[in-house]
């Protein structure tokens, strides 16, 4: 019943209020505002992994991976389901894992108040924000969800003049989109959800077939060659992007961020090992991936060895771009801060510098024999991860940000909302959440 669901929303909000009042926020740090005023291009790359990158075959990806801020211990949280990985990258929250693809967290968030998504956050700072996807806009309802994140959104059948294929061309998407934001005097943020890397990995894949010649002499099996070939379309898109940024005179002030939506599940384990050139441990290392954060013009690279994963990208970027946000309201952690650094996988397994925890078998694997992990330590981390998932579900299912910031909400009623008088702007880092207890 409607009354029941309103009660449920109220309970969720109350529990979340109480939980957040106990959480220690991360502080501003030396990297706060480092990229203020830079343009930002973020890319959620379909089935991406770093193992095919080389200076010879993919010079642009190689350059992007080795220039700027280098995250040495980054793990993509998800095994499969694009919408979950994309959601986590965009929201800094975990999806409600009890939801299905068709009833995803993204769908629910399509009507929620989302102040921390990069599109909305950077628009507040005077940026224009564009979003693109090279498949149809109705797929996963991106035309609704991405507009709600602050993007002027275009997809292959809605505003983006490209051929729809299986998969479509990331290069064509790039060619059809860059003029939107390069023609403006304002700083810009553009977000891309790519498609060319989508399985199946054989020569019926339109992008694998297109780039087949470039991989024909590589020493791999056909599926691995086909995987690399379709990902060369992403490389070509990025090469084109870099050229256009240079021509427009904005290359030296544009940060480019790229990560995967999920592990390339279209490859068998043997094929993935073949591509990686090593036997990957299936619990943890197969999720090792890239959080490319290309920043031109630093005097030297910033190398970060903290363990981190998909949800950490948003808070890290908000901090770098000088957006004030209350760090307690996101599940991820700014990787450059002094917070708790942990790489989290979708089954709640996790990795830290000291140990790894396999949730499936409830096994602890210390980083080396000299380290003893106490039950209390393990329990503290397990609880930390559980809480982040629970908090994330509560936030999406109760339109929690609308409640905190006193906004009208489709998820509850205004009577449910507490208006905080000490908030001057939506990003005020006042301790807004030491809140009412009822």
Which residues make up each language-model segment?
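Solvent-exposed soluble domains appended to multi-pass membrane proteins
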Residues: 18-438
